[in-house]
Swiss-Prot record:
Sequence ranges of Polar residues compositional bias: 575-586
PROSITE patterns reported for this sequence: B3 (PS50863), PB1 (PS51745)
Compartments where found: Nucleus
Region (Disordered): 1-20, 546-586
Entry note about domains: Interactions between auxin response factors (ARFs) and Aux/IAA proteins occur through their C-terminal dimerization domains III and IV.
Family matches, as Gene3D superfamilies: 2.30.30.1040, DNA-binding pseudobarrel domain, Phosphatidylinositol 3-kinase Catalytic Subunit, Chain A, domain 1
Record's keyword terms, sorted: Auxin signaling pathway, DNA-binding, Nucleus, Transcription, Transcription regulation
Stated name of the protein: Auxin response factor 25
Length: 899
């Protein structure tokens, strides 16, 4: 039996390269003899060496526990991170017992601070694939008998017999670990017939001194060679040879060598005996990090662990964690070696260790500390305690890993305090999941953040307000400037070409926006300077006219100046000749929108007067109050049109007042600039809508989380329809969509009703959702036609030819899932019907194969709702969206759509 030799700092640290290559054995055969659970680490990789585990191997080999008189080495850490320079596989010449020689070198403190793991360039040890193992019986080891081979094993590993012969027979040549050849006669005979090794077998048994209970292994490798190895049964050695050092000497030697190497960063050599060692004590660093820092365990948690059984097979045994503590808190404090005390379920596991290490077990209940393959995210928030570095400052996974460095030493007084294990070898495990529900964010977090920031802007130093606003709105993306400039081009076309229809003007503006990208880029610095001057000017006017506006525009004056219900809003911009100011206000509209959208202010005339400071009192009042009975949509008479920007406020939010921006000559305003960060979960897609004051499904192109919407309306006294290009939001992309033909789209309050993410038929006022099924074209379904789930399932069965399949999903395997407005994927039928009808976004029909794939955690089966909506609408409205340009692609989202 090979034991660890006495190690010292003066002994040779590694074998010569040529000698090491000569001694290196066949990797497949060596691993087959070592056992199915043994895997040597890759050369030139980083490993964790446990002196405590090395001492266990010595104690198991010598049948003597560690003596308490052995000196302690306080400077030797319980786990030593090393570089593996060399691995050589060996086999004892007499017993064929396998062992490995490893040359390690502890990492320096500078190397331990490296944030990335180096790529493992070495080749992994080759494991056997085509082999069989059999435990010898008494007849197999008798001198007059042969070796009986199981039929399946013989057909799998041995070369095929020629059954035309009688009896079928052949000669086999096998090589052992020492490259010795052994010849056997393979014959198929007996009653019943079986595969036997006859001639040559008894010679092999005698030479190897095999007994019943030992095992033999045959391997057929890729080179069409037959390999032969043996694995001896564990037999306790009662008398140690006198030439072998005592157990205490070996313990002292290995500890002294490791302590000297740790202090001097020098190389040292160890020997690993997989058949004698209770557990591996040289662990790959990636495996160690995953188990210790990315697997949460607690007392009472269930787990399973792999064990080797008869004939080189493995089996999982179940157990329960009963305690988590140090195995030896005096000599090895803060050690992860066998830190988990367990209780085994089966009584037959009496020979199993009562304590195990974290990397040896597989907890049955774990927490999502690294990304899961299952595409569905958690429906309810879970306070995981994950740090929020990189979430709101634009940091990515690398920033997150750099901030959340992994603590690998629980003793704060020793060596390096942390390791940033983020690199090639462990990236699938070490990228934490960034999810707003996991971070415990409440739904109104974004509104609270925006309100707090707005208060600071409103009452803070004016010199600090506008540069930050300008930097966010104008330099975040080129598209922010393109939007405003595009709006100015539209205004110019409307002003100088009054005979064109609104739709033609919008289409021409899109074409020019496509072809004049170079011109727009050249005008962007000029646009930024103009916006800066405009913002500063507005701020000065706000400070000067605050008291004046509060006195002149009281609520009594506003009520007196209200127009009658049969009159329309006058063309204030045309009468006052304020086209330049209105156009400038459009260019700087993003600051107006961002400021007035979120803040709750008790004096709405103040902000309107700041933006349109040259309007008279009556004109400003007309801008604030719109008659409920007026026909606000028009398609002709373009010079007299007015565009109003409203913030439709939920009835339960009395502190939020509608803010209306009025623009002369009525270009289409596409929300210029970049919006402040907000969740993308409330965004929606609108294609068509029709006037219906009682239908709450009419909506805007943007919806915030609290139900507040931002819409574009048009006021005109002549006709009741006009073309408004809609906005589509998908991910971080906001593009114009097909034109919205609308009439009387306002509710009784003068604003659009909240969006429910459902398309509206312009001819019937019916609400539609889209239904998808793999292998079939998508269909649109009027959800208002149904009053129960049974009617919905019957219609889906008829549309997709699935009669009788959707009513009984347990029997048929077909499942119906839907995406709601919160981008959650749920089963159809779990919610009350009315709640389902109000929240459904789209429906997906899953086949039995897709359900199984989903259960197994298949990626991509249910893609993110944002991506799926983008794809589906691009298919349905290709002609409309193909020519449209991205006019607000710089909209930021705090939480991503994809989970």
């Amino acid at each position: 039996m090979k034991l660890s030799p006495p190690a010292s700092a003066d002994m040779p640290q590694a074998l010569p390269e040529n000698d090491g290559e000569q001694r290196c054995l066949n990797s497949e055969l060596w691993h087959a003899c070592a056992g199915p659970l043994v895997s040597l680490p890759v050369v030139r990789s980083r490993v964790v060496y446990f002196p405590q585990g090395h001492s266990e191997q010595v104690a198991a080999s010598t049948n003597k526990e560690v003596d308490a008189q052995i000196p302690n080495y306080p400077n030797l850490p319980p786990q030593l991170i090393c570089q593996l320079h060399n691995v050589t596989m060996h086999a004892d010449a007499e017993t064929d017992e396998v062992y490995a020689q490893m040359t390690l070198q502890p990492l320096s403190p500078e190397e331990q601070k490296e944030p990335f793991l180096p790529m493992e360039l070495g080749a992994a040890s080759k494991q056997p694939t085509n082999y069989f193992c059999k435990t010898l019986t008494a007849s197999d080891t008798s001198t007059h008998g042969g070796f009986s081979v199981p039929r399946r094993a013989a057909e799998k590993v041995f070369p095929p017999l020629d059954f035309s012969q009688q009896p079928p027979a052949q000669e086999l040549i096998a090589r052992d670990l020492h490259d010795n050849e052994w010849k056997f006669r393979h014959i198929f005979r007996g009653q019943p017939k079986r595969h036997l090794l006859t001639t040559g077998w008894s010679v092999f048994v005698s030479a190897k001194r095999l007994v019943a209970g030992d095992s033999v292994i045959f391997i057929w490798n890729d080179n069409n060679q037959l390999l032969l190895g043996i694995r001896r049964a564990n037999r306790q050695q009662t008398v140690m040879p006198s030439s072998v050092l005592s157990s205490d000497s070996m313990h002292i030697g290995l500890l002294a060598a490791a302590a000297h190497a740790a202090a001097t960063n020098s190389r040292f050599t160890i020997f690993y005996n997989p058949r004698a060692s209770p557990s591996e004590f040289v662990i790959p660093l990636a495996k160690y990090v995953k188990a210790v820092y990315h697997t949460r365990v607690s007392v009472g948690m269930r787990f399973r662990m792999l064990f080797e059984t008869e004939e080189s097979s493995v089996r999982r045994y179940m157990g329960t964690i009963t305690s988590i503590s140090d195995l030896d808190s005096v000599r090895w404090p803060n050690s992860h070696w066998r830190s988990v005390k367990v209780g085994w379920d089966e009584s037959t596991t009496g020979d199993k260790q009562p304590r195990v290490s974290l990397w040896e077990i597989e907890p049955l209940t774990t927490f999502p500390m690294y990304p899961s393959a299952f595409p569905l995210r958690l429906k309810r928030p879970w306070a995981s305690g994950l740090p929020m570095h990189g979430m709101f400052n634009g940091g990515g996974n690398d920033d997150f890993a750099r901030y959340s460095s992994l603590m690998w030493l629980r003793d704060g007084n020793r060596g390096t305090q942390s390791l940033n294990f983020q690199g090639h070898g462990v990236s699938p495990w070490l990228q934490p999941r960034i999810d707003s529900p996991l971070l415990g964010l409440k739904p109104d977090t974004y509104q609270q953040m925006a309100a707090a920031a707005l208060e600071e802007i409103r009452y803070g130093d004016p010199s600090k307000q506008h540069p930050a606003t300008l930097q966010y709105q104008q330099t975040h993306n080129l598209n922010s400037g393109l939007n405003s400039l595009f709006a100015s081009h539209v205004l110019g076309q409307v002003q100088f070409q009054p005979q064109q229809s609104p739709l033609q003007v919008v289409q021409q503006g899109h074409c020019q926006n496509t072809g004049d990208s170079g011109f727009l880029q050249g005008q962007l610095p000029r646009l930024q300077l103009h916006n800066t001057q405009q913002l500063l000017k507005e701020q000065e006017l706000q400070q000067q006219q605050r008291q004046h506006v509060l006195q002149e525009q009281s609520s009594q004056e506003m009520q007196q100046q209200l127009p009658s219900s049969d009159h329309h809003v006058a063309d204030v911009a045309s009468e006052s000749g304020s086209a330049p100011q209105a156009q400038s206000s459009l260019l700087s509209g993003s600051s107006f929108y961002n400021q007035n959208l979120l803040e709750g202010n008790s004096d709405p005339p103040l902000h309107l007067h700041n933006n349109f400071h040259n309007f008279s009192n009556q004109e400003a009042s007309n801008l604030l109050i719109l008659p409920r009975s007026s026909q606000l949509m028009a398609s002709d008479g373009w010079p007299s049109k007015r565009l109003t920007l409203e913030s439709a406020v939920h009835p339960e939010a009395p502190s939020m007042h509608p803010k209306i921006e009025k623009v002369n000559h009525q270009g289409i305003s596409h929300f210029p600039g970049a919006f402040p960060p907000q969740s993308a979960r409330g965004c929606s897609i609108v294609q068509d809508c029709r006037a219906d004051a009682e239908n709450r499904l009419l909506s805007s192109s943007f919806e915030l989380q609290d139900g507040m919407t931002s819409i574009i309306t048009d006021a005109n006294r002549e006709t009741d329809t006009m073309a408004i290009p809609l906005l589509r939001y998908s991910g971080a992309d906001l593009t114009t969509e097909n034109t919205l033909a609308t009439s009387n789209c306002l509710g009784e309050s003068g604003t659009f009703n909240p969006l429910n993410n459902i398309s509206v038929n312009p001819s019937q006022g019916a609400t539609f959702v889209k239904v998808y099924k793999s292998g079939s074209l998508g269909r649109s379904l009027d959800i208002s036609r149904f009053s129960s789930y049974c009617e919905l399932r019957s219609e889906l069965e008829r549309l997709f030819g699935l009669e009788g399949q959707l009513e009984d999903p347990v029997r048929s395997g077909w499942q119906l899932v839907f995406v709601d407005r919160e981008n959650d994927i749920l089963l159809v039928g779990d919610d009350p019907w009315q709640e389902f009808a109000n929240s459904v976004w789209c429906i997906k029909i899953l086949s039995p194969q897709e359900v199984q794939q989903l259960v197994r955690g298949g990626d991509g089966l249910l893609s993110s709702p944002g991506a799926r909506m983008q794809q589906s609408n691009a298919c349905d409205d290709y002609s409309a969206s193909h020519n449209m340009q991205n006019i607000a692609g710089n909209i930021a989202s705090v939480a991503p759509l994809d989970y």
